[in-house]
């Protein structure tokens, strides 16, 4: 694996994992509201 490729992919992977984390958190919050009502 080329080090330059890792340097380029690193921020993309971090942004993708951050987006997935935020979407997951939002979904859990929505399900929590639905269950409470």
From Swiss-Prot:
Coiled coil: none annotated. This is Photosystem II reaction center protein Y. Residues 24-37 are stromal. NCBIfam families: PRK13240.1 (NF009711). InterPro entries: PSII_PsbY. One of its GO terms (molecular function) is manganese ion binding. The chain crosses the membrane at residues 5-23. It is found in: Plastid, Chloroplast thylakoid membrane. The gene is psbY. The keyword Secreted does not apply. HAMAP family: PSII_PsbY (MF_00717). PSII is composed of 1 copy each of membrane proteins PsbA, PsbB, PsbC, PsbD, PsbE, PsbF, PsbH, PsbI, PsbJ, PsbK, PsbL, PsbM, PsbT, PsbY, PsbZ, Psb30/Ycf12, at least 3 peripheral proteins of the oxygen-evolving complex and a large number of cofactors. It forms dimeric complexes. Residues 1-4 are lumenal. Keywords: Chloroplast, Membrane, Photosynthesis, Photosystem II, Plastid, Thylakoid, Transmembrane, Transmembrane helix. Its main location: plastid. GO terms for biological process: photosynthesis. The lineage of its organism: Eukaryota, Rhodophyta, Bangiophyceae, Cyanidiales, Cyanidiaceae.
